[in-house]
Amino acid sequence: MKFFIDTANVEEIKKANDMGVICGVTTNPSLIAKEGRDFKEVITEITNIVDGPISGEVKATTEDAESMIKEGREIAKIHPNMVVKIPMTVEGLKATKVLSQEGIKTNVTLVFSANQALLAARAGATYVSPFLGRLDDISTPGIDLIRTISDIFEIYNLPTEIIAASVRNPVHITDCALAGAHIATVPYSVIVQCTKHPLTDAGIEKFKADYRAVFGE
């Protein structure tokens, strides 16, 4: 399973990229708004850091297919690695079909059911993004959805990749890997959590103590 980082914060992206563990970035209107910067400026800066798929979403106020297609084409022009992120709606599927036929990569987002994922894949989506944590929030096991989508895509040999989104903790990441997600897009804080374990910390401190006992500081 591959790791993307889910943020529009350039400093977080630089730190994660320096670890050598991420191979793509996902953003959304909320993450861009949080940075308080121009969309194109932020996205261009990100493409200069990470050499991999960069998801940039159409505006939250864009609701009709024609507008999504127009905006998607502009997003795709920013860089060859751009992926146009489109909401899972009837109009979104129409836009996905057209953009995919034009060779533009698409990421259908806000997926909460296997049927939605299957429709997006049939429309030509490069990626689908089921939201794990948000399903958990309403007492519906999000990991079951990831597993079901993975099974369906495997049965029908669909090329669309699953990006597990709304990942909240390291357990989610392990579960997604076991459930067959191709990618987990993860906040920087969760990536850092994954590097830690109390026994690792204890082992490092023991090595330090043993070294100092023999060689001093």
From Swiss-Prot:
InterPro entries: Aldolase_TIM, TAL/FSA, Transaldolase_3B, Transaldolase_3B/F6P_aldolase, Transaldolase_AS, TSA/FSA_arc/bac. The keyword Transferase applies. The gene is tal. The active site is at 85 (schiff-base intermediate with substrate). GO terms for cellular component: cytoplasm. It comes from Lachnoclostridium phytofermentans (strain ATCC 700394 / DSM 18823 / ISDg). It is found in: Cytoplasm. Keywords: Cytoplasm, Pentose shunt, Schiff base, Transferase. NCBIfam families: fsa_talC_mipB. This is Probable transaldolase.
